Amino acid sequence: MIKIKNLVKKYGENTVLKDVTLDVADKEIVALLGPSGAGKTTIINLLTGMIKPDGGEIQVDATPREVGLMLDVGGIYSHLNCLENLNLYARIYGLPTSRSMEVLESVGLADSAKKAASELSRGMNQRLSLARAIIYSPKLLILDEPTSALDPGTGKSICELLEKLREDGATIFLTTHNMDEALKLCDRVALLHEGEIVKQGEPVALCEEYNALRTVPDLESVFLQLTGVKL
């Protein structure tokens, strides 16, 4: 579904991505893990065409209408309420407006349907952005930190929703710095540090390789051993 090969991105003399290679297979959930400034959002911006690479190749086997995006900014109209925001996208994609409430329910915002986006908390805005991304059931979801502003209980519910979307046929590529979330949700993870992927693989297998199983698998310990950086 996604193929990234030897990707390079520079800003002036600063190389922010260094020879990044990563694949995401059909109906797979893959997370890009790393601290702030590691290059996660840069990769998302390259995938979505917002910026251009300075080297390497990117292939996405989906048309723009088959890709649902949840980015840090954009896509939500602050003067509209939650339901109006989704109804706008429902009309664009030729969907019945009943789909809007269905999706709001799935992200836990049904009770806030008539609340203006400008009045939402950061976490609620994040869930509204996810609702916008999934309203037309895209076959590929690209999500930038989809649970970063959520409390643990709500974050768990959103992870369960993402797993259901995958069961329904979606491929999901996301960025996160939440190791527990990645461990429970993802088929594979790629650990990104200072613009380089230092390791990638199945989460529990990585924990086994680096003796980080302990009582429960600990991806944070794996990252610390590989980079010297604690998340």
Where are these regions (language model features)?
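Helix-to-loop junction immediately C-terminal to a conserved catalytic motif
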Residues: 48
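Conserved ABC ATPase "signature" region
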Residues: 87, 91, 96-112
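Conserved ABC ATPase signature
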Residues: 116-123
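Catalytic Walker B motif of ABC-type/P-loop ATPase nucleotide-binding domains
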Residues: 141-144
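A short, surface-exposed alpha-helical micro-motif characterized by mixed small hydrophobic
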Residues: 182-184
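ABC ATPase "signature
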Residues: 200-201
